[in-house]
């Protein structure tokens, strides 16, 4: 992996093409995600969004109208809109001066993440620009798992800079926990991940369809499957076991579903609670508990690590993240926190810093093969 050289921004200008005009790239009411906002903070006055690619032009126009009325208008005032990456790449054929320094891909997973035509957006770009820099949101694909691993092998042919949007790896409490584990040479015996989401403002209809979103584990709990692997290592996928509360169970009836769930076929309705367990190849055990039961807006999240004499607990990943550590020296926990830490900012600072040559490639903490392993675990849990 090398720093981007293809049309690297001259004169201090950094050109970005954004794929997707939806919530992950431009924000939603029920969460802190807003990729464009973080890119704006990292790049400041040097940012120029030269392309916004989205199949619905009216969505692109709505976003651009809002941006051009804001204090970052300078970055969007000359943005061109396209309905597909194919159309955009055809434009670049005759306008090489507009080749971007990076692509920000934040769209549903149906269009990328494998080698199948129509779902191979990464390859579509890299065949023309093999040194391109791609930031790809999770989940990496909706294709069969083997398709994602096929793409892992194809990507080895290119010199692309690729970062997957597992932002929690970049939290300072997570990195502090990684350092604590390494410094104390801990042999992790168990990881316990808990993710309780607030559902009443999640009014994206596709999210409530199993076949469209992939289900809540693939779409949402994926973050904590990823963190579990980050600390626990590779999973023995033959050991995965799952229990769940479904929509038709008495305790699965939700009072404030923000969409007309009756319009969704019964076989497509998503589970309310999922409990999964597995063994890592190291012999350790992993546990995941995910729910869509909370109301309001705040999520409740926690990841625990257990090792001989040590208990490491990370909480409130979407709010004010805190790290609790109990060691053999004392029964009481010590608390470590980093006020106002923003993992979204941290991941884009790392990605863009590598593209600019400010950081070594190792600053990117989630590569495509990491994303493929996480996707594999979430699909096995979902299909179990």
Curated annotation (Swiss-Prot):
InterPro entries: Gfo/Idh/MocA-like_OxRdtase_N (IPR000683), Gfo/Idh/MocA_Oxidoreductase (IPR052515), OxRdtase_put_C (IPR013944)
GO cellular component term, pick one: cytosol
GO molecular function ontology, one term from the record: nucleotide binding
Family to which the UniProt record says this protein belongs: To S.pombe SpAC2E11.17.
Protein name from the UniProt record: Uncharacterized protein C12C2.04
Source organism (scientific name): Schizosaccharomyces pombe (strain 972 / ATCC 24843)
